[in-house]
Regions:
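Juxtamembrane low-complexity tails/linkers enriched in Ser/Thr-Pro and polybasic
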Residues: 52-64
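Extended hydrophobic/Leu-rich segments
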Residues: 48-51, 55, 126-129
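Hydrophobic membrane-insertion alpha-helices, especially the h-region
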Residues: 69-89
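N-terminal targeting leaders characterized by basic, low-complexity, disordered sequences
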Residues: 1-52
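Solvent-exposed, non-transmembrane regions of membrane-associated and secreted proteins
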Residues: 82-394
Length: 394
């Protein structure tokens, strides 16, 4: 026996060797290593949770981060609302131009001159309309059957290239058709409508018939655009449509305005930019005058209009003439300055030719302006310089 050799240990049945701890990694204590093993594994967030936490304030966000998220959320909501509103406007205009206007135009044929020519109404309906309006023109019967508020039809331009070609409505106030179309449905486009104070019964018109229409032209949508292109009488070079300010007038010197009882042509003689706010200068009440009790009242009105007109024509006027006023909104100085563009026409007299010598038309370079307009555009009014002999009753 080698007494220097360590004796072998004896193990009995069931004996278990004591566990030995692994040394902690370098730089960690045993306590640190143990705590690290005891931490549960983090659950991975799905993409929706991450997106929610990135957009909306959550517990643990700093004040600055919460404010940033709130501002961002408000901006997104505003963008969605604005975008939805713009899309609604585009659809509204598209529907008005391509559906409503087209359907109404199809129902109106000014060439229909006999009751028999009205093919889309039953005999009973025709008789009913004639009992209500004995003198109605056959061409208006179908439209009248659809909406009895119709009082006429306004057209500017040739049949194959209309600038305006729309029915004219009238209600008990000037608000109803401001936001309703021929079908009486709500729309931002509204309809062309006559001032509620104007008379149309049995073809007896007021001395000054005033028609209103929105300025909503959108060349991408096509169609009429209500009264938007009336502003071309004020300045034909708007949007580069024409090279000369007079070009639009020379192409469209007359307006067709047929009532339920009579067809008629009207000669354009003036175009004026009117102010509607006293803070910017004189507010001339051009839409408030519908009848003239005296020759002096008529002359005074025409003188006031011609002094302000940017357009001089060869059309003469006299007391007893019927006047047509077409009015639309127009903002050459921005919407802060609420202005209107109005075109004035005189009814072609019995036996008179509807022809106009457009070669004699001129641009008035120095019209009477309201205060704000004069300050922006410059130019001092030098008094009445137009040919007053054109006002025969003056």
């Amino acid at each position: 026996m080698n007494y220097t050799q360590r004796p072998k240990s004896r193990r009995t049945a069931g004996y278990k060797a004591p566990k030995t701890e692994k040394p902690a990694p370098k730089g960690e204590t045993k306590t640190d290593a143990g705590e690290k093993d005891e931490k549960p594994a983090r659950k991975k967030q799905n993409i929706f949770m991450k997106l929610r936490n990135a957009i909306f304030p959550v517990k643990g966000d700093s004040v600055t981060e919460s404010v940033r998220k709130i501002v961002f959320d408000i901006a997104v909501v505003a963008l969605v609302i604005t975008g939805g509103s713009l899309l609604a406007d585009v659809f509204d205009r598209w529907y008005q131009v391509n559906i409503v206007d087209a359907k109404v135009e199809e129902a109106y044929d000014p060439e229909v001159e006999t009751i028999e020519g009205v093919v889309n109404l039953s005999d009973e309906k025709k008789e009913e309309i004639l009992n209500e309006k004995p003198s109605i023109l056959p061409s208006f019967m179908e439209l009248y059957a659809q909406n009895s508020d119709i009082v006429g039809w306004i057209s500017v331009g040739e049949a194959d290239d209309y600038v305006i070609n729309l029915p004219v409505m009238q209600s008990e106030d000037n608000d109803y058709y401001l936001t309703r179309n021929f079908e009486r449905k709500e729309t931002k486009s509204g309809a062309v409508f006559a001032d509620f104070r104007n008379s149309f019964e049995n073809g007896n018109l007021s001395a000054n018939t005033v028609l209103y229409g929105h300025n909503i032209w959108d060349q991408n949508l096509g169609g009429s655009g209500m009264f938007a292109k009336l502003t071309r009488y004020y300045d034909a070079t708007i949007n580069g449509d024409y090279d000369n300010r007079l070009d639009f007038y020379k192409k469209n010197p007359t307006v067709t305005f047929n009532t339920l009882y009579e067809k008629s042509e009207w000669k354009v003689f003036a175009c004026v930019l009117f102010n509607t706010q006293e803070e910017y200068g004189v507010v001339y009440p051009y839409t408030q005058v519908h009848d003239f009790d005296t020759k002096e009242a008529f002359n005074s009105y025409i003188l006031d209009i011609m002094d302000r007109s940017v357009l001089w024509t060869d059309v003469d006027l006299t007391y007893g003439d019927e006047i047509l006023t077409l009015s639309t909104c127009y903002y050459p100085f921005g919407k802060k300055v609420d202005t209107r563009c109005a075109v004035f026409a005189r009814k072609v007299r019995d036996g008179e030719s509807a022809e106009v010598d457009v070669s004699k038309a001129q641009i008035n370079k120095n019209p009477l302006k309201f205060t704000y307009q004069a300050n922006v555009e410059g130019g001092e009014w030098k008094g009445r310089t137009w040919d007053t002999s054109k006002l025969l009753s003056y």
